[in-house]
């Protein structure tokens, strides 16, 4: 319970996209979210009924489309209560991409996005809008094991990022036979796929997304550039309380994340696996920044060239990961 005697809810949405039987197929994403589900059930006090899992396994009744993912996130936010201290958690494993940005002074002139199974992209703007809808006193932790995931919550403060000091650990790559696949989809690959569905010849990705998904398309694609900039400024100005968003990304915005296949068929995401290793080796509560830095160290020791990042307020950087009981 919180200080006011309200019962603290722990709510989660876990999404894994393997894109089976396509040229973009991955192998470890569903394993990632199933492992995370077991972890939050056994260690962090989550209940089975408060966890929604979306995967693109053939037998899955509800696929992780863009609309379904956003609907699940909205349901989670709607269940949260102001002043309750509710813990909201979103884990995504799948492809990520970058698309041309309309925002001024953007360091890479591109926006980050995740790639649901139907390619209805969810961008950093959509996640910013979601965070701004959180009731006061709740928190939203997002782990994205995808390429270009740094900065996936727009305007979130960088705590651990490209400017962070390296730990200088000597790599000691494991000798187990592995197959490494990037969890990145280049913009052109996304554009070509959408164009094959719409039959429209244009490099404007928004045209394709609006044609295919209409009002279910992301906010970035439904608003003209100037209106979007005005909305972003308005959302930032109205955010008076401490920002409740916490993003742990599998890599920097200009990097790729690895999908690792091993001989026994137990594939996994490199970042998700690093998180699991750190948690398994440390039973006590951990600060968010500790978890990310230790995951960085694990990846460096294993020889992976990706650098997990942390984006959140100063206060949340020192907060306990998922408020471990």
Swiss-Prot record:
Keywords: Apoplast, Autocatalytic cleavage, Glycoprotein, Hydrolase, Protease, S-nitrosylation, Secreted, Thiol protease. The record marks 183-184 as: Cleavage. The gene is AMC9. InterPro entries: Caspase-like_dom_sf (IPR029030), Metacaspase (IPR050452), Pept_C14_caspase (IPR011600). GO terms for biological process: proteolysis. Its main location: secreted. This is Metacaspase-9. Belongs to the peptidase C14B family. Its EC number is 3.4.22.-. Inhibited by serpin ZX and nitric oxide through cysteine nitrosylation. Cysteine protease that cleaves specifically after arginine or lysine residues. Does not cleave caspase-specific substrates. Required for proteolytic processing of GRI. Expressed in root tips, cauline leaves, flowers and siliques. The modification S-nitrosocysteine is found at residue 147. The two subunits are derived from the precursor sequence by an autocatalytic mechanism. It comes from Arabidopsis thaliana. GO terms for cellular component: apoplast. It is found in: Secreted, Extracellular space, Apoplast. Glycans are attached at residue 177.
């Amino acid at each position: 319970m919180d200080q006011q005697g309200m019962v603290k809810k722990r709510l989660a949405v876990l999404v894994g996209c393997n894109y089976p039987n396509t040229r973009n197929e991955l192998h470890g994403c569903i394993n990632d979210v199933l492992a995370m589900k077991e972890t939050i059930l056994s260690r962090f006090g989550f209940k089975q009924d408060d966890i929604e899992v979306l995967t693109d396994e053939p037998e899955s009744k509800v696929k992780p489309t863009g609309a379904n993912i956003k609907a699940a996130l909205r349901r989670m936010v709607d269940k949260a209560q102001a002043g309750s201290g509710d813990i909201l958690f979103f884990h995504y494993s799948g492809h990520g991409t970058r698309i041309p940005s309309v925002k001024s002074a953007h360091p890479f002139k591109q926006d980050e996005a995740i790639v649901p199974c139907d390619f209805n992209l969810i961008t950093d703007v959509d996640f910013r809008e979601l965070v701004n809808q959180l009731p006061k006193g709740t928190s939203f932790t997002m782990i994205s094991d995808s390429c270009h995931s740094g900065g996936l919550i727009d305007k979130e403060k960088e705590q651990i990022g490209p400017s962070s000091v390296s730990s200088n650990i000597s790599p000691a790559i494991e000798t187990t036979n592995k197959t490494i696949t990037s969890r990145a989809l280049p913009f052109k690959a996304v554009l070509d796929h959408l164009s094959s569905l719409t039959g429209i010849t244009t490099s404007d990705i928004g045209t394709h997304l609006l044609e295919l998904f209409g009002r279910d398309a992301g906010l970035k694609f439904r608003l003209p550039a100037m209106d979007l900039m005005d909305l972003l400024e308005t959302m930032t100005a109205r955010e008076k309380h401490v920002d409740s968003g916490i993003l742990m990304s599998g890599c920097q915005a200009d990097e790729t994340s690895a999908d690792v296949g091993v001989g026994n068929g137990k594939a996994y995401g490199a970042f998700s696996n690093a998180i699991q290793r750190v948690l398994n080796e440390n039973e006590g509560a951990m600060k968010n920044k500790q978890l990310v830095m230790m995951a960085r160290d694990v990846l460096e020791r294993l020889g992976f060239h990706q650098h997990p990042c942390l984006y959140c307020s100063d206060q949340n950087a020192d907060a306990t990961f998922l408020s471990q009981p």
